[in-house]
């Protein structure tokens, strides 16, 4: 999914980085579960991983919806595993799941729910500008915040716009600035046309 948004016909780099970060987190979670299995003398049984039903996600909104449902399914599986551990009197596994997985899942689901609400309110996917702004202002800012907390990384990014003080502007200021950048060249063209008309007349 991450590399879909890195393609030249999608070109939404912060969607790309967001999904790549999610993929890395899930791989780390799988490694933690396998390490716990080995630590406790168990055996790891691997199963086939089914490929996604769709090869292209068409829009950032559809990709976010797909991710949201996947995260809810993962959360449900973890809850069922927690219930099984509790029924079999395994407090260590219960504690491991609560501290390392379930709390993080709740935060991820809440975050994705907020992203979906914002995309719908902005008119995605019909309004192409909505996904562009969401990519730059929401995902870009959240990745900057993550980078500030964890330090510079290979996938870190700078804010779209920032005043001389270095802190990023509020979203509405970013939107206003982008609007002005798109309108000012048009005004300059109109003025040059008007001057040309006056000169010719």
From Swiss-Prot:
The answer on whether this UniProt entry bears the keyword Transcription reads no
Sorted alphabetically, the Gene Ontology BP terms of this entry are: intracellular iron ion homeostasis; iron ion transport
- Provide this UniProt record's keywords sorted from A to Z: Iron, Iron storage, Metal-binding
Keyword Lyase in annotation = no
InterPro entries found in the cross-reference section = Ferritin, Ferritin-like, Ferritin-like_diiron, Ferritin-like_SF, Ferritin_CS, Ferritin_DPS_dom
Question: Domain Ferritin-like diiron, which positions?
Answer: 1-123
Matching entries from PROSITE patterns are given as: FERRITIN_2, FERRITIN_LIKE
Cellular compartments per GO CC:
cytoplasm
Output the Gene Ontology terms for molecular function: ferric iron binding; ferrous iron binding
Return the CDD domains for the record: Euk_Ferritin (cd01056)
Superkingdom of the source species: Eukaryota
The similarity comment for this entry is: Belongs to the ferritin family.
Q: What is this protein called?
A: Putative ferritin heavy polypeptide-like 19
């Amino acid at each position: 999914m991450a590399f879909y948004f890195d393609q030249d016909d999608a070109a939404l780099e912060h969607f790309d980085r967001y999904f790549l970060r999610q993929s890395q987190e899930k791989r780390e979670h799988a490694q933690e579960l396998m390490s716990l299995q080995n630590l406790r003398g168990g055996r790891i049984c691997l199963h086939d991983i089914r490929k996604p039903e769709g090869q292209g996600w068409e829009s950032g909104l559809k990709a976010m919806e797909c991710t949201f449902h996947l995260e809810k399914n993962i959360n449900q599986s973890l809850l069922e595993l927690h219930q099984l551990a509790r029924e079999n009197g395994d407090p260590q596994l219960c504690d491991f799941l609560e501290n390392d997985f379930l709390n993080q899942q709740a935060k991820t689901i809440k975050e994705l729910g907020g992203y979906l609400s914002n995309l719908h309110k902005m008119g995605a996917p019909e309004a192409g500008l909505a996904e562009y702004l969401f990519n730059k202002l929401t995902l870009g800012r959240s990745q900057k915040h993550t980078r500030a907390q964890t330090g510079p990384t290979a996938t870190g990014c700078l804010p779209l716009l920032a005043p001389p003080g270095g802190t990023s502007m509020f979203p509405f200021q970013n939107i206003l600035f982008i609007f002005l950048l798109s309108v000012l060249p048009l005004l300059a063209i109109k003025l040059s046309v008007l001057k040309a008309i006056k000169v010719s007349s």
